């Protein structure tokens, strides 16, 4: 993400913080001196923009894209990040893959067979996310 500076924003800074578009709103709100009055998923990264310490966000990030056309028939492509780990299903017709982005930022070596513990851990979190997203309020769980 590239941010153009203004008053108080440190020029030329770089960071490894993983932020998402949902983090822009709370950042702008904090910069305006206001408060978000309800629960939201995004988190402010204003301290980072001001050149202050910004702890990493302790959260999972989930990504979904629904594919159309005859080949995919509306199936989804899924991914999640937990720290340096990424679990991804790049096509509805492929297996889930696991990557350690600190060692393999290009995602060239699938570790799902070598690190079964991490694969199961992230897989369980992904299942919960998918089930929550598809939940219908009146259905029993």
Map each language-model feature to its residues.
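Conserved N-terminal phosphate-binding loop of PLP-dependent enzymes in the Aspartate aminotransferase
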Residues: 1-2, 141
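Cytochrome P450 catalytic domain signature, combining two hallmark sequence patches
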Residues: 56-57, 117-120
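Active-site-proximal N-terminal segment of extracellular/periplasmic enzymes that hydrolyze or transfer
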Residues: 109-117
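Charge-dense polyanion-binding interfaces
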Residues: 121-140
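C-terminal cap/loop subdomain of S1 sulfatases and analogous C-terminal strand-loop tails that border
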Residues: 7-13, 17, 22-101, 132-136
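Intrinsically disordered, low-complexity polar regions and short flexible loop motifs
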Residues: 104
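Generic leucine side-chain signal with a strong bias for well-ordered alpha-helical environments
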Residues: 98-101, 111, 122
């Amino acid at each position: 993400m590239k941010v153009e500076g203004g008053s108080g924003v440190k020029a030329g800074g770089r960071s490894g913080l993983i932020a998402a578009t949902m983090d822009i709103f709370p950042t702008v709100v904090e910069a305006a001196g206001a408060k978000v009055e309800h629960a939201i998923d995004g988190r402010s990264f204003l301290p980072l923009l001001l050149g202050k310490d910004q702890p990493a966000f302790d959260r999972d990030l989930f990504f979904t894209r629904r594919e159309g056309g005859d080949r995919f028939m509306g199936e989804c492509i899924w991914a999640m990040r937990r720290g340096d780990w990424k679990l991804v299903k790049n096509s509805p017709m492929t297996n889930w893959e696991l990557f350690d982005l600190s060692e393999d930022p290009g995602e060239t070596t699938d570790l799902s067979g070598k690190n079964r513990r991490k694969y199961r851990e992230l897989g369980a979190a992904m299942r919960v996310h998918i089930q929550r997203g598809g939940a219908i309020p009146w259905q029993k769980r």
